From Swiss-Prot:
Location (main, coarse): secreted
Subcellular location: Secreted, Cell wall
Keyword Secreted: yes
Entry GO CC: extracellular region
Protein name per UniProt: 28 kDa cell wall protein
Alphabetic keyword roster: Cell wall, Secreted
Superkingdom, taxonomy of origin: Eukaryota
Gene source species: Nicotiana tabacum (Common tobacco)
Length: 10
C-alpha cells in the first residue's frame, strides 16, 4: 500500500 487509493479508503 501507501498510495492515493489507500489514503482514500481510510
Amino acid at each position: 500500500g501507501x498510495n492515493n487509493v489507500d489514503a482514500a479508503r481510510k
